[in-house]
């Protein structure tokens, strides 16, 4: 599903060149549940941006579902993101002036789905998350756990092949974090590849494979006992 070979990524800051990813190799198969760990500055956030087609890379190759992600126009990159990927963030990234249903339906708006259809689908996914009764509520009326469930429903509604989650439990208490990880497990059980970036060991242990990144390369990886 995801193949990286010799991936390099650098940033220019003033007169300095910051080499973040240094020839990284990685393979994640279809239907895997994987966590990516690393300290601040290890390159894990940059890696997630490349995987999410939010940033380019300098050298090497990145294949998503056997398609090379290279030299993409903004329009083409957006098409791949909308059709292949779902995103979940630590800060939820919900639109404050839209209710839960409207937030969940948003990806379908960009795909040209009619309002009636996308709202029906949004209600279906909110129901799956146990939030059907919260459809008309605004983000500021919901708890952190509820907001993250809305964000997960939004990521799922376009039926992506891969979910990319960046510190999805970072703003949640321990019990809610475990509930969210159980949701990711259920999503993964349907055949969707789930990749979670985290610095929390107990969260990584809820995935099937843990990849540790250090100084822009994979330092180690192992199968979780989960």
Tell where the protein language model's regions lie, with residue ranges.
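H-loop (His-switch) and adjacent beta-strand-loop-beta switch element
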Residues: 210-222
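ABC family nucleotide-binding domain
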Residues: 2-213
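ABC ATPase nucleotide-binding domains
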Residues: 225-226
């Amino acid at each position: 599903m995801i193949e990286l070979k010799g991936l390099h990524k650098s940033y220019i800051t003033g007169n300095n060149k910051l080499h973040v990813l240094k020839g990284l190799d990685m393979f994640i198969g279809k239907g895997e549940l994987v966590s990516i760990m690393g300290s601040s500055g290890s390159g894990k956030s940059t890696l997630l941006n490349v995987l999410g087609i939010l940033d380019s890379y300098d050298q090497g190759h990145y294949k998503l579902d056997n398609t090379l992600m290279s030299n993409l126009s903004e329009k083409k990159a957006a098409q791949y993101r909308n059709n292949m990927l779902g995103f979940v963030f630590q800060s939820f990234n919900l639109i404050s002036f839209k209710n839960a249903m409207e937030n969940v339906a948003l990806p379908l708006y960009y795909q040209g789905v009619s309002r009636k259809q996308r709202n029906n689908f949004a209600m279906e996914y909110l129901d799956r998350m146990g939030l059907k009764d919260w459809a008309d509520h605004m983000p500021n009326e919901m708890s952190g756990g509820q907001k993250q469930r809305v964000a997960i429903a939004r990521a799922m509604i376009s039926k992506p092949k891969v979910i990319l989650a960046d510190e999805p439990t970072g703003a949640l208490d321990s019990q809610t974090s475990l509930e969210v990880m159980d949701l990711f497990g259920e999503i993964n059980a349907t055949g969707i590849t789930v990749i979670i970036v985290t610095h929390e060991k107990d969260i990584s242990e809820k995935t099937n494979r843990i990849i540790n990144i250090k100084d822009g390369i994979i330092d180690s990886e192992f199968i979780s006992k989960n």
